[in-house]
Amino acid sequence: NRFLARNCVFLSIIPKLFPNLSVNLLLRTPQKISYITLTMNDFRFLVITCLIAMLSCTSSLAQLAKRSGSVSKSQSADFQIQASKKIDRLVGADFRRKQIRPLGKANDAEFMRRAYLNAIGRIPSYEEAVSFLNDESPDKRNNLIDSLLGSYGYNMHMFNWWADLLRATDEFEDTSGAPYIKWIKDSIAENKSYKSMVHELISATGGGWQNGAVGYYVRDQGMLKDNMANTTRIFLGTRIECAQCHNHPFDSWKQMDFYQMAAFTNGIKTAKSHLSNYLEDKEDMDGVSRDLIDVSRLIRYAVYDFSIQDTGTGTIRLPKDYKYRDGDPGERVGAKSLSQFGKTVKVSTRSKSTDPGKSRVKFADWLVSPDNPRFTKVIANRMWKRVMATGLFEPLDNFSSASEPSNSALMSYLEELLIDLDYDLLAFQKILYKSYSFQLRPNAIQHPDRSPYHFNGRQLKRLSAEQIWDSLLTLKIKEPDKRLGNGYTGDAIMYRGRPVLVGKKSMRDLYNEVMEIESGDEVWDYTKKLHDQIKSDKGVKSGGGESMQMMMAYNAGKKYG
């Protein structure tokens, strides 16, 4: 039918061209379905059929090419080169305006070391260095960038960056951070867009062993106001924590602004907290063995406490000592995004819990939307600093109303480019790495803090702890990027610091079984049963060494390590 509608003009002239051909057409309209009946006494019908098929295929292929072109722009080598050249033109224009004499181009050895340390977080091995330095191809620098950014080393180095940004750790007090760590690593490995990652983090709900993104809130459990302060610092480049207690003395943020933002995530609760409390009460009873208490705590901390059941009320009460005219002490206010960042989103206060379960989703939608241009500006600047060593505005997380990028035209283009790439951070970095600006010689002149740095080569900086460690490993072992993790437990059940029931039951299994339990007596019976299973596990009896080896092999096979 689509074919008939597309080619109706051509079909209408068939009877005039071929009088021996009888053609009856009912062309498609929005209300009707089209049919075609052909009676042929002339072999020329075969020719017509072929021509019609060619027309239809040509149209379909053109549409397919158009669609695939928009999807693969970030993979287009020509697009990357043109974008890199535009960045260089904008940097060069700033040189002329500021009368800066550009540094020369870094030699191959300087470029190689910089590329390795920046892209995968370590120095090149001897073999890698010899291979690159002896390469005489004109595109060897771009080829090296492609190779490094496509390696496992890039994933691990990028994980270090994300872990630092999100303050991710192996443990959250008494709860394992393994699901959160794995979610971050998996997101990097599949090259999930920055926009998608942030939206998933902010709107995350469920259990950690089903959705590791809930670790973003479990990390700050019981400190939701601090979590919101970190959210605005990380994703909006703005520090509003000062306004938690009073209006900001040097910026436009008010205490009301802080509480309206905090309302988006206020009221988040862990799943089935009544059963968690039941286990805690049981642990305090006389006659309960220490072993059973430890198993009970395993269930409480790793299952119930690592889950988000309620996504927030969307309202919050002002503190009792609130003293400003725009609100009363103890007054309940609705969530509202910061008006300084463009179009706002609000949650009403008409009921105690307005739009239950949707306030965080509304916040996540607004945070990553075009209505909030600050979101794009902040991550574009973070990526520029990651590659070029110094941000277009500094500090990265304190962009105030008085802040101005050192190169406004370049900042605007980087924002435009990131949107054009659909927030593909890998493609964005590749463009920066392939620019001539990245290849300038290092700038050894110390730049004053908190003053605009008009880019003229990467400033020298100390290596991070991770870069030092991975570089030392490069001197000692072969293929350092392929080494297994150092005791990363994946989804193994950890009891007293040792993996148990390896290959028999995982934390995902444990989570699913526990979350089906509805009563306190049932969860206590399950706890005792799990205790017996753990005590009979050979890994525990042998001191854990055998179990640890089994766990590492098991996790490596399942790609957890």
Where is each model-derived feature located?
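Bacterial N-terminal signal peptides that target proteins for export
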Residues: 37-47
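Bacterial N-terminal signal peptides
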Residues: 48-56
